Amino acid sequence: MAIEGHKPERKWLDAIRRDWDVRARENARAFINWPDIADEEGAFFASGREDYAMYVTPFLKRTQFDPHGKVGLEIGCGIGRIASRMVEDFGQYIGVDVSPEMIRKASSYELPRATFQAVSGGDLNGISDSGVDFVFSFAVFQHVPDKEAIFNYFAETARVLRPSGIFRFHMKGLWTLALGRMQIEAGLSNSASHVTARATRFPFVRLRYLDTWQGRSIRPAEAKAKCESLGLEVLEMEGEWTTMMWVGGRKK
């Protein structure tokens, strides 16, 4: 399923692959889960279990989705931090990443019922139409500087999901003004001391230089409209106007 008029820039896709390959070779764990537990493999994978318990399990329960025997796909799998937990629930796990080096390292762990595949950074080529039950992505789109690449992943999710399949994406959901390679961002803090209530979150405005670490923000209404235009029903949105916005839904 292509999005007419929405084509990621080749220069960005090449830069993303190059930079994340370098990061994977330098210290994959540090760049995936920056940086405190990067030197301890056990703690690194334990953090994946914690994030799964926080961001995946409750969503599956809210949507009354039973993952057993189902196919789950993760966009931006890295070296398998969350995959190591996800394979316990799903009948089959597919992890995709823009970095072939990340994929090589993830494959080396030989997780059961798991396959890993390098992708271009803007599509899910090689994944069958209507062959996936759940698509998940965490701490990935925030690093993508090309908004069209993010939206292509939305479209590819609509393509690969079975009818009634579900998805959950994390992204930066800030107000933005694009100025070429720069981006003005405005939103609400989501720091640990300000997450208990929206009223206690303080506003901020900042200027960001877009690269393969500081990616685009997607405004909440824009994310919802794009999903709906692709036949993806948005069931819930959390963390609007923060760097921890979640969009979850179901294929119609």
Predicted segments — roles?
Residues 125-135:
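A short acidic, Gly/Pro-enriched loop at the edge of an enzyme's catalytic core
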